[in-house]
């Protein structure tokens, strides 16, 4: 029995580095690494029973490639990168409580920066311009601003709670009622309530899982229902957004600005118009980086569970996608 580690484009230690960590943590376990680069030879796969993956190549996890596969572990909290799995093969993700707090603080920081015009003051500083008039003309009191959070999972719930704690008026939206919103937040559920939710969200935070139902959700029609000048924070996945429609809303002034931490292609290509757009702040997918120590402990535990025939922890509902 063997374990396969595959990591493509995720930065950090890469497949070889993670494989070395797993070997050190679990002596005697056969751990093989594959970076998935074009032309890179694959290691033997026929006896692989457990795979630890980040953006595996399409088809790698199919039964034809890994006939002995019994369990798959994502390197991150998200699993949209994994792709299709053979029927009956369980999928686990990383659950890091501190990650939710890191995400929440990132969201709150950028929401406050927006209503206090921080980027405008930085622009004025570069120009040597005293811009005290902005305080009266554009700044807003936190208690007058409605922050809408899409997604009420661990991260969405943490972001909603922290936004409310600093004084924002918080509303949440989720596709289903699987989990309720934090106390004190106005809840909206389902497609039939989405427009009402959007219409009252001065700041919109996307923390939805990426599924076939949410892919491309943030399009021209969606953005048209936000209040004029709304601010969009995307810290979920780039696949939620139709880039051309978002750029159109920004160019027209319909949308006041956007903080984007995730993209269709990462790293974001140098020629992408987001880089130079005056209303866009680009972050390199750093809103909530997984703790290496936390991830390693969970990965090793689930690896051993699969090898010993025990159920993994932090399992994903494969049909739902999260």
Regions found by a protein language model. Give the residues of each.
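Phosphate/diphosphate ligand-binding glycine-rich loop within oxidoreductases
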Residues: 46-126
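Short, conserved loop/helix-junction motifs that constitute active-site signature segments
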Residues: 60-68, 83-88, 223-228, 249-254, ...
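N-terminal glycine-/charge-rich "phosphate-binding" loop or analogous flexible N-terminal tail
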Residues: 1-50
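Rossmann-like adenosine-cofactor binding region
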Residues: 177-273
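Glycine-rich NAD(P)-binding loop of Rossmann-like domains
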Residues: 122-158
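Redox-cofactor binding/interface segments in oxidoreductases and associated redox assembly factors
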Residues: 51-53, 74, 205-206, 234, ...
């Amino acid at each position: 029995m063997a374990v396969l580690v595959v990591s493509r484009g995720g930065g950090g230690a890469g497949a070889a580095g993670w494989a070395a960590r797993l070997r050190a943590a679990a002596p005697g376990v056969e751990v093989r690494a594959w970076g998935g680069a074009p032309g890179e030879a694959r290691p033997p796969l026929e006896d692989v029973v457990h795979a630890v993956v980040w953006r595996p190549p399409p088809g790698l996890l199919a039964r034809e490639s890994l006939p002995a596969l019994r369990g798959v572990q994502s390197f991150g909290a998200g699993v949209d990168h994994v792709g299709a799995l053979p029927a009956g093969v369980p999928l686990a993700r990383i659950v890091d409580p501190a990650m939710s707090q890191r995400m929440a603080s990132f969201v709150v920081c950028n929401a406050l920066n927006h209503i206090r015009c921080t980027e405008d003051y930085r622009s004025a500083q570069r120009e040597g311009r005293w811009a005290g008039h902005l305080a009266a003309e554009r700044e807003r009191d936190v208690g007058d601003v409605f922050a809408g959070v899409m997604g009420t999972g661990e991260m969405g719930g943490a972001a909603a709670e922290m936004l409310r704690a600093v004084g924002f008026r918080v509303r949440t939206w989720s596709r289903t009622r699987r989990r309720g919103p934090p106390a004190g937040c106005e809840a909206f559920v389902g497609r039939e309530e989405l427009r009402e939710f959007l219409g009252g969200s001065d700041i919109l935070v996307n923390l939805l899982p990426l599924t076939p139902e949410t892919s491309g959700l943030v399009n021209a029609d969606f953005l048209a229902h936000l209040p004029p000048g709304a601010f969009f924070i995307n810290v979920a996945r780039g696949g939620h957004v139709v880039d051309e429609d978002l750029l159109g809303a920004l160019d027209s002034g319909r949308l006041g600005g956007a903080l984007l931490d995730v993209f269709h292609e990462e790293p974001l290509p140098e020629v992408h118009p987001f880089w130079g757009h005056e209303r866009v702040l680009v972050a390199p997918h750093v809103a909530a980086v997984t703790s290496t120590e936390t991830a390693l402990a969970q990965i090793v535990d689930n690896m051993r569970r699969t090898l010993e025939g025990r159920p993994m922890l932090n399992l994903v509902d494969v049909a739902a996608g999260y």
